[in-house]
Each structure stands twice: as structure tokens, then as C-alpha cells.
């Protein structure tokens, strides 16, 4: 039996809802698995976030097909950042400690 427990709304949920409505100013683009947003603070030029749509609590909450697409989108974002930023490599970070919803920090280095 599927657990129908409702996940708490997070800032990730709000950003995705705003992106869907065209109200999120930091949107870079829509990708198959979600949304790419500029990081609120550009501590490294080109820092972006990948937010899944629909929002899920963790990578492990995605089915195999959705998980594969999310990770492929993540790596394609990295490829694009290498091209436009001149970065040597890209750091990818999935934490979820502060906001308990899947999102990836994609940081050019």
C-alpha cells in the first residue's frame, strides 16, 4: 500500500510553483526533469540549481526512468556550464539537509 503522507512544503516547492507560473525570476530554462535556476547568491559565477518537477523528497523517491532523466539533465547542465564559463570541472551536490526536497547545486570550478 502506498503511503499517502503529504510532504511538508519547502522553498523548493515554492520555487517550482513560481517557475510553472512564470513568476520565478531566476529561471534559466526548463529541462525534461525540472527547472534550472540561477543560485540566489552567485558565490561562484554560473552557480545554478536543478529542481525536479514534480518535487520529491529525495533522489531515491524517483522511479528508475525519472531518476535517470534527472541525473542526465544534471550532467547536461554541467556540460553547458563548462562551455559557457570556461570551468575546468563541475561540482554537483545533493544535500537536502536544510530543505528536505530533492535539488542539486551545480557549481562550475
Give the location of each predicted region.
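HIT superfamily nucleotide-processing domains
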Residues: 1-109
Amino acid at each position: 500500500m502506498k503511503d499517502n503522507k503529504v510532504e511538508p512544503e519547502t522553498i523548493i516547492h515554492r520555487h517550482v510553483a513560481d517557475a510553472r507560473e512564470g513568476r520565478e525570476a531566476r529561471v534559466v530554462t526548463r529541462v525534461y526533469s525540472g527547472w534550472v535556476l540561477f543560485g540566489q547568491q552567485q558565490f561562484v559565477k554560473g552557480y545554478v540549481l536543478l529542481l525536479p518537477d514534480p518535487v520529491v523528497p529525495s533522489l531515491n523517491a524517483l522511479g528508475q526512468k525519472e531518476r535517470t532523466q534527472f541525473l542526465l539533465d544534471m550532467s547536461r547542465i554541467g556540460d553547458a556550464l563548462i562551455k559557457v564559463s570556461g570551468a575546468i570541472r563541475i561540482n554537483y551536490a545533493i544535500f537536502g539537509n536544510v530543505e528536505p526536497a530533492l535539488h542539486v547545486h551545480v557549481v562550475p570550478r
